[in-house]
Regions:
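Macrodomain-like recognition of ADP-ribose-binding/processing modules
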Residues: 1-171
């Protein structure tokens, strides 16, 4: 498995699967999901809100993941991933649990490449370095079926922090 750390726009990176960061209210308000919404993902937002309505919920629990779309996007699988609580707090364990669940869905769809953002680090209060620690734990915990994992960050300094956390974690 090749792991690439990329400075850029996650939606512009080739990949079959996409982990999409989200919140407990399933609003596509910023980060990756905000970018999806701006680029034609209104149907994804409707799908998320329909889930809440169908289930009689106002919000979902931290760690919730849900496959959405992927139309109109070229990804084979997009997984909306809630790695924060209602106050936007998170921790390494929650980020790792959420990422594991999201990657498991994407892997089950036969995807051999996946694009991953730094979950819980935008509006969420997890540091980029702590996300790197969570990422390392997830990717080293089992044999994943991915040939390529793209970890994508728009901010160059943030990308360095993710890499520091990823490389600094000792098992």
């Amino acid at each position: 498995m090749i792991i690439e750390f990329i400075h850029g726009d996650i939606l512009d990176q080739p990949g079959e699967g996409l982990v999409c960061s989200g919140n407990v209210y399933l609003n596509m308000s910023g980060g990756v999901n905000g970018a999806l919404l701006v680029r034609g993902g209104e149907a994804l937002q409707i799908q998320l809100h329909q889930y809440l309505q169908d289930e009689g919920l106002k919000f979902v629990p931290p760690g919730f993941v849900m496959e959405i779309g992927p139309e109109p996007f070229a990804f084979r699988s997009i997984v909306y991933s809630v790695a924060i609580d209602g106050w936007y707090d998170s921790n390494i364990e929650l980020a790792a649990e959420t990422l594991t669940s999201a990657l498991s869905i994407i892997e089950s769809r036969g995807c051999t490449s996946v694009n991953i953002p730094a979950l819980a680090t935008g509006y969420g209060k997890l540091s980029k370095q702590d996300f790197g620690v969570a990422l390392r734990r997830v990717l080293s915990a089992r044999e994943w079926g991915f040939e390529l994992v793209n970890v994508v960050e728009r901010n160059a300094y943030g990308l360095e922090e993710i890499q520091d956390g990823y490389r600094g974690e000792q098992e």
